[in-house]
């Protein structure tokens, strides 16, 4: 997910995307704690995607 692509989305789409990413992060944390997570790098990817979405939302709020 690129920030340039996120900037083209509406605020409502970004909020929906953020909600989905937060749910994915929660599920990954649960899988990690139970030992079911094989690809641990996905936690880092989701965390950075969340940061990208929040950054774009803040940019749109300030504009």
Curated annotation (Swiss-Prot):
A cellular-component GO term for this protein: cytosolic large ribosomal subunit
Keyword terms: Ribonucleoprotein, Ribosomal protein
Name under which the protein is recorded: Large ribosomal subunit protein uL29
NCBIfam families attached to this UniProt entry: L29
Source organism, top-level taxon: Bacteria
PANTHER family for this protein: 60S RIBOSOMAL PROTEIN L35/50S RIBOSOMAL PROTEIN L29, LARGE RIBOSOMAL SUBUNIT PROTEIN UL29C
UniProt-recorded Gene Ontology molecular function terms: structural constituent of ribosome
